[in-house]
Amino acid sequence: MLTLDTLNVMLAVSEEGLIEEMIIALLASPQLAVFFEKFPRLKAAITDDVPRWREALRSRLKDARVPPELTEEVMCYQQSQLLSTPQFIVQLPQILDLLHRLNSPWAEQARQLVDANSTITSALHTLFLQRWRLSLIVQATTLNQQLLEEEREQLLSEVQERMTLSGQLEPILADNNTAAGRLWDMSAGQLKRGDYQFIVKYGEFLNEQPELKRLAEQLGRSREAKSIPRNDAQMETFRTMVREPATVPEQVDGLQQSDDILRLLPPELATLGITELEYEFYRRLVEKQLLTYRLHGESWREKVLERPVVHKDYDEQPRGPFIVCVDTSGSMGGFNEQCAKAFCLALMRIALAENRRCYIMLFSTEIVRYELSGPQGIEQAIRFLSQQFRGGTDLASCFRAIMERLQSREWFDADAVVISDFIAQRLPDDVTSKVKELQRVHQHRFHAVAMSAHGKPGIMRIFDHIWRFDTGMRSRLLRRWRR
C-alpha cells in the first residue's frame, strides 16, 4: 500500500507549506485569541507547544495510507511515463478504461483530449502526461488537506480542553511563566471538570487563609545564601574613631533630657517643691526625662587597632526538591486536613514556579506517595486532595521513608517537610541519630509544620525549623479578627 509521504515525494507536493498554513489558522482561531488575551502567561506555553504539533502532523501524514484507487492510478501513471509514443498509443484505450473504472477526476478530461485530436503525436503524449500529473497533484493535495483538517479539528478539541483546565488552574498554580509552561504540559492528561474542581476548591481555601500561604512562601524561600568564614587569615590594621572626655573646660552647648541632678534647669527643680508634682518629678528622674544643661566636654580621636582578616565565601544554597510527609491520622481530620492539603498545594505552586520537584508522602499505617510536579502532576494532585485522613500516626515510618528517599542521588539536596499535629509517640533512638547524621554530614534540612500548639517538644526538637500554624478555634478566630 502506497503511503501519503511517498506520494508527496513522487509528485513533489510540499506538505510543510500545508502544515504551516494549518497551524497559523489554528493559532488565529477566535477561541485561542480570546484565551491568550485572558491568560497571557499561557500564551508562551502554548506557542512553545507548536513544534510538537508540527511533528505530530508530519508523523500523521507520513503514516497515512493512500486509497487503493489513487494508488492504482499512480502506478498506471508511472508505467505510462516509461512508454514511448507508439507504445503509449497502443496502451491508451486501456489507460482510458482504467481511469474511467477508478472514477478518476482526470478520466473525462483525458477522453476529451484524445477525442479532440485524431492523431496522437509526441507533443500530445507529453501534454497528456503533464495534465495527468497535475490531476494527481490536485488529488494528493486534497488528500493532505482532508487529513490535516481532521487533525486540526482533533487538535483544536484537545487544545480547548487543555485551555479550559489551564485557565481554571492558572490563578491557583501558575505564579510565573515557568509555572504556566509546566502547568500547560501537565494539562495533557484526560481529566474531567469534576476532577480538577478539587484543586479549585483548595485553592480558594488557601486564599481564605493568607497566613498559611505566607508560611508556605517563607518555607520555600528559607534556603538562602550563607557565608563561610576562613580561619587561616592574617592580621590587618584598621582605624576607627573613639570618643573620649576632653581636657578643656566644659561649656554649655544646649539642652537635653537626662537624670543629671547637678545640671537641672530651675523650672524642673521648682516642681520638686510642689507636693502635687513631686511624684511626677521622680518619675521623670527615673525615666531620664528631666531637662538639663548639655555641656561640651567630649572629643573624638583616631585609634589604630588590629583584627584578623576574615574572608567569606558566599555559597548560594541550591533550592532543591520538597519531600513532604503529611500526617493522615484521625486527629488531623477536619480543618487540619484542609490546611495540610492547602499547604501542599501552595508548595506545589512554589515548585512549579521555581522548577523544583514536589513529592508527597501520606503516612499513617502505610505510606502512600504522590509526585505533584511530574508530567501527571495534576492527576496526582487530584488523587492526593481526594484522600481522607482517617488513619493512625506512625511518625517513625515517615522518617524512615524520608531517609530512604534522601539516599538517592536525585534527592540529595531535598528539603524534608513534615506536616502534623505531632501528638504521637517519641521517635526511636536509631531514627533520631540517623536524622542528626543527615543534618550534620549531608546538610539536609528538616522542617516541621505544626498544626497544633500541643505537639510534643521531644519530637519537634529534631527539626531545623518549626513553622507553627495553630488550627485551634481561638487562633482561627484571632486570625479572622486581624484580617
UniProtKB/Swiss-Prot annotation:
SMART domains: VWA. Gene3D superfamilies: von Willebrand factor, type A domain. Its main location: cytoplasm. The keyword Transmembrane helix does not apply. InterPro entries: Uncharacterised_CoxE, Uncharacterised_ViaA, VWF_A, vWFA_dom_sf. Homodimer. Interacts with RavA. NCBIfam families: PRK10997.1. Belongs to the ViaA family. This is Regulatory protein ViaA. It comes from Shigella flexneri serotype 5b (strain 8401).
